[in-house]
């Protein structure tokens, strides 16, 4: 059913693409719209893990993700190598355009189903990124780490900070799919959420 939802979404686009075209590069917005709509059955499929491995590939050494990536695409060798190289470009990690929060949730749902440690590790690294990126005053910059520019300003636009705080609340309340997280992470998430409220 989850895979059917993905195919149906693509098929109803104005371009009337073939069902298999969802594995080709699409506008990044397709990913952030589709990812939250997958049902639990989808995460039992090999396709879910293929996409999950792409998500891990694009995760940067900061623990965060760059924005505007269509994760379901089947990558060419050149795209794969470019993604590997970009892992160390720490200036691209962001919470803008639903980046990082979308990937954390996807990997958490995938881990719940597969129990594969690599997906759990991806989730934990992503959460640590959010915690490290928070300013002392409780806000989050659009990009972290970046030394200067508008990227380092607290990001209220596009609901970026709100999405982060909603995710942190789900984490410390241990709501699905975050039921597996250790208590120390939940405590850190609660503290970060409370700081965000005060910002």
What role is predicted for each listed range?
Residues 83-114, 129:
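Long, hydrophobic/aromatic-enriched structural stretches that serve as scaffold segments
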Residues 30-43, 51, 56, 101-116, ...:
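Well-ordered alpha-helical scaffold segments within catalytic/enzyme domains
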Residues 51-63, 122-139, 188-199:
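Long, well-ordered core segments of solenoidal/helical folds
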Residues 18-26, 59-88, 132-152, 199:
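Glycine- and aromatic-rich loop/turn segments at beta-sheet edges
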Residues 154-196:
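Aromatic- and glycine-enriched pocket-lining scaffold segments that form the walls
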Residues 1-18:
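Bacterial Sec-dependent N-terminal signal peptides
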Residues 17-25, 36-44, 85-100, 148-161:
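Solvent-exposed loop and edge beta-strand segments that line ligand/cofactor-binding
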């Amino acid at each position: 059913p989850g895979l059917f939802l993905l195919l149906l979404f693509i098929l109803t686009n104005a371009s009337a693409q073939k069902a298999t075209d969802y594995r080709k590069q699409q506008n990044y917005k397709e990913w952030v719209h589709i990812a939250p709509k997958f049902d639990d059955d989808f995460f039992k499929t090999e396709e879910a893990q293929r996409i999950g491995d792409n998500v891990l590939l694009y995760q940067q050494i900061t623990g965060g993700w760059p924005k505007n990536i269509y994760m379901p695409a089947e990558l060419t060798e050149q795209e794969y190598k470019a993604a590997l190289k970009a892992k160390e470009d720490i200036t691209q990690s962001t919470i803008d355009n639903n980046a990082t929060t979308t990937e954390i949730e996807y990997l958490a749902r995938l881990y719940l189903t597969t129990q594969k440690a690599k997906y759990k590790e991806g989730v934990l690294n992503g959460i640590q990124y959010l915690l490290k990126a928070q300013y002392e005053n409780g806000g989050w910059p659009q990009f972290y780490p970046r030394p200067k520019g508008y990227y380092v300003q607290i990001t209220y636009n596009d609901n970026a900070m709100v999405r982060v705080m909603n995710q942190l609340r789900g984490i410390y309340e241990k709501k699905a799919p975050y039921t597996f997280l250790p208590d120390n992470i939940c405590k850190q998430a609660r503290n970060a959420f409370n700081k965000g409220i005060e910002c």
